Amino acid sequence: MVNYPNGRSQSYSAVPKKQKTLTELSVAKKSAPKSKSLVAFGKRGMNFEAEINATNDYYLSRGLAVIHKKPTPIQIVKVDYPQRSRAKITEAYFRQASTTDYSGVYKGHYVDFEAKETHQKTVFPLKNFHEHQIVHMSNVLAQRGIAFVLLHFADLEETYLLPSSYLITFYYEKNGLKSIPLAYIRENGYKIETNHIPRIPYLEIVNKLCEVQ
């Protein structure tokens, strides 16, 4: 059993279901209501994270970059040992990530970035970022790495790459503001025009960041 962040747990039954006959399957297929297609990002059926993962897979397959999503750390709470040589995790929880979502290498440069999404139309809430992530990105920049955030405005269907230096500056000089204005992101960031393949061509902008280092 694994406890997910929303507190729900998932278990699976090992008892096989009764096989249906061909006639039963045919009748069920005809009577089943047609389901609506899932649309979560840009009306293409993918959410923001899936778009980024697909883009990274494309870059890897073309030998352009090696960038992966960092696994979410898990806190193991209970382990059973049904046999001496075999351990079974029976209870575990997802822990809060300590750094950012993605990291890798591009043209000899270390790349590190966070990806966030909002349904707000004029601002991006700062509550989406934790101070330890801001500190981590500051440390990456101090080592001459490439650090940034990908910000997706779902309702506007707009995606921006904001260099971490601008996020860090705003985070510590926000003057009581709880959100980053979209105008600030547009002024200091780069709008990403989504494609079919790759989905989110952010390396085109990373090239520019490499040039100014």
Curated annotation (Swiss-Prot):
Subcellular location: Cytoplasm
Top enzyme category: hydrolase
Keyword match ATP-binding: no
Domain of life of the source: Bacteria
EC number: 3.1.21.10
Any matching Pfam family: RecU
Entry keywords, A to Z: Cytoplasm, DNA damage, DNA recombination, DNA repair, Endonuclease, Hydrolase, Magnesium, Metal-binding, Nuclease
Cofactor: Mg(2+)
BP GO terms, sorted: chromosome segregation; DNA recombination; DNA repair
Free-text remark on how the cofactor is bound: Binds 1 Mg(2+) ion per subunit.
Residues annotated as binding Mg(2+): 99, 101, 114, 133
GO CC, alphabetical: cytoplasm
InterPro entries, A to Z: Resolv_RecU (IPR004612), Restrct_endonuc-II-like (IPR011335), tRNA_endonuc-like_dom_sf (IPR011856)
GO molecular function, one term: nucleic acid binding
Function: Endonuclease that resolves Holliday junction intermediates in genetic recombination. Cleaves mobile four-strand junctions by introducing symmetrical nicks in paired strands. Promotes annealing of linear ssDNA with homologous dsDNA. Required for DNA repair, homologous recombination and chromosome segregation.
Family note: Belongs to the RecU family.
Annotated protein name in UniProt: Holliday junction resolvase RecU
Organism (species): Lactococcus lactis subsp. cremoris (strain SK11)
Lineage: Bacteria, Bacillati, Bacillota, Bacilli, Lactobacillales
